[in-house]
Amino acid sequence: MKGRTVLEVGADGVAIITITNPPLNLLSVDVMLSLKESVEEALPRENVKAIVVTGSGGKFSGGFDVSVFGGSDGRKENRKVGFMSIEFLTDVLEASSKPIVAAIGGPALGGGFEVALVCHARISTSTAQLGLPELQFGLIPGLGGTQRLPRLVGLTKALEMMLMSTPVTGQDAHILGLVDSVAPTDELVNTARSWALQILERRRPWVTSLHRTDKLEPLAVARAILKVTRRQAQKQAPNLRHQLICIDVIEEGIISGPRIGLLKEAEALEELRQSEITRSLVHIFFARRGTSKIPGITDLGLPPRKVNRIAVVGGGLMGSGIATALIVSDYHVVLKEVNESSLLDGIGRVKVNLESQVKRGKMTQEKIERTLSRLNGVLSYDSFKDVDLVIEAVAENLCLKQQIFADIEKYCPQHSIFACNTSAFDLNAIGERTKSQNRIIGAHFFCPAYVTPLLEIVRTERTSPQVIVDLLDVGKRIKKTPVVVGNCTGFAIGRMFFPYSQSAMLLVERGADVYRVDHAITKFGMPLGPFRVVDRVGFEVAIATSNHYVKAYPERAFKPMLISVLQEENRAGESTRKGFYLYDDNGKASPDPDIQKYVEKAQSTSDVTLMKLSDGDIVEMIFFPIVNEACRILAEGVAVKASDLDIASVLGMEFPAYRGGIIFWANSIGSTYICSKLKDWSMTHGDFFKPCAYLVERAAKGASLVRHLNCFCSVLHVEQMEKPLLVFDMLLLELGGGTGLYTPYVFGH
Ligand SMILES: C[C@H](O)CC(=O)SCCNC(=O)CCNC(=O)[C@H](O)C(C)(C)COP(=O)(O)OP(=O)(O)OC[C@H]1O[C@@H](n2cnc3c(N)ncnc32)[C@H](O)[C@@H]1OP(=O)(O)O
């Protein structure tokens, strides 16, 4: 049984029904049936005058357990569609002859919130979280939320809460009229009890949300709002249907009446819950939470040490972004620069970052000064004597980084963590001039560091588990999703992303059209096609990165001619307003009619046969090499879990979350198909496409690409091992086939 409700009747005649499924009191069919039983038991009892519904442990309910959605449950419900929403919640609970009040602490989300909306009044704590975030799973609210929320807060606010999946606090819910009264946690249930009795005595209104109309906009206005919202949703997410379905269901209720709306809602949910999109988004939900669970590290029981003061070395784009992320989350930061003017520039960038947060509504103007007071600019290492963590974020120059690490070792206390924000260099090389290898770790932030939610944490074979646990904790406090990876050129995210532009160049040099490639890829769901990405990054950086990868992975790197040809024409990307695209004063990109001329020049440098490709071919030829690289990363143990790469691809590359991340998507296509395509292309176009051993092995078995590293934590490079090829037995636990097969693995590059 997955949870239940508990019924207790007090001497005052109020029955308390407590949803009990800790820790979040998630709903399940069992909980709902138990709630129904408790309500049906309480209603006819003579000693019950009113009912309060609440959740155990001060948490109302986090909503339905989403692991049952997306077809993973297998349990088929035989009940009629709408049974819970209409026959129970509406016809029994909402229509009850005794007042029912919800007492809400903690989360009241999704189905949990919908139960509360059915009640005749809601009392909450000020910090409770109330909302309908079902759309984040490709679902729509299924227990009446689409009908009741607009009737309680008006259409505009309801649409915002549902389509953005953003909850409101109890305090804000009170202002919106969603909550009738706010009470302190320890008085919550008693306040709800007396409210319920007051409703009975007609001293408080007895409201059935479904029948309210006072907050609903007039029909013509409502229709206009829905039309605009529908258009926006179509524009923002052309590959997704569930937002449009949600809007249709709301409209149906407004035009044909809420009961018809309820039925339409239940039918739509039934269809959506089995969709591939829901399956993918549910996977992303759990995968994201899973990134901070590192076998052999976070299961050691090491509590994170308290990090109070952090030093950031370098106030450039990355350093100032990192400092911003830290001070916004209440850390005290020392920002070190080499001279007065660079320091002023760095602090200036932090201010600009904070102001941009004000413009985006993420911070108030008044908070800027207080936040900035946590930033202390310095020119020497003297104030590093009490820092717990240093994050080095200077330019990608190995000698400079080595010198900084040697310097900070002299000034910092013994316990300080030394983190490096490199996206490229081997951390062992960076720490070569120190004796502190066990406290060196990579903290790879993504630009802009104070916005992008991803933090790639890079460990070497010598980084201590305590240091990893500490950085995970800092990451959590600054609201980043960490992905812990091993040490190698490009780490996991850079390596996975590298083939994105490489394949695109290869395709164009073999006959594809630049803009057709970008169009096919954005249609697939990427926000920017590969050529727009190269323009944004800038040709100089793109070439430097490319050289780095070509050096590290020569056997599979493609050396494009196209960028060099464009560079000869003084094009350098978006910053010069001329790259693959032309850019206007506002940075708006438009195709360049001259581009084909340069493409033909690049094509003429080799004697390849030009291809004709469909959009589907383009998508496969761009993404299968990424899948291939992801497989290498998994096989080498650079990533611990396939789902970590899914999150890395979604947060680091903006791969569409509704496709579940790179490996999840690849599995939906099948390893055999992907491998056979790569094999074919490698015959014609060379080793860039050659499938790696891991992919070939999985494809031969028709197996999933999911494999979890069991417990070994470090990635060893063969060239760094004293006795190469001796003893590195990496136990790989195969979860995909569920056979528990252990395979010895030796790797290197
Ligand atoms: C018919 C209905 O309309 C359909 C629905 O109700 S769909 C569900 C709607 N509910 C939601 O979207 C809520 C999703 N959950 C959340 O936003 C957050 O978990 C929360 C705000 C409730 C709590 O946050 P927080 O305290 O930080 O805990 P968090 O780490 O996220 O979750 C704790 C555990 O519960 C799990 N969990 C949370 N919500 C869950 C859910 N709805 N289903 C399944 N598991 C859930 C998490 O995976 C995590 O598991 P773990 O400990 O094994 O890693």
What spans do the regions from the language model cover?
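Conserved CoA-thioester-binding segment of acyl-CoA-metabolizing enzymes
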Residues: 1-54, 91
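N-terminal glycine-rich phosphate-binding loop for ADP-containing cofactors
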Residues: 3-5, 10, 20, 32, ...
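Conserved beta-strand elements of the Class I
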Residues: 15, 311-313, 733
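Conserved catalytic cysteine-centered active-site region
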Residues: 90-102
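Gly/Ser-rich catalytic serine loop of serine hydrolases
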Residues: 102, 106-112
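Intrinsic disorder
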Residues: 728-731, 745
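Conserved class I S-adenosyl-L-methionine
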Residues: 730-738
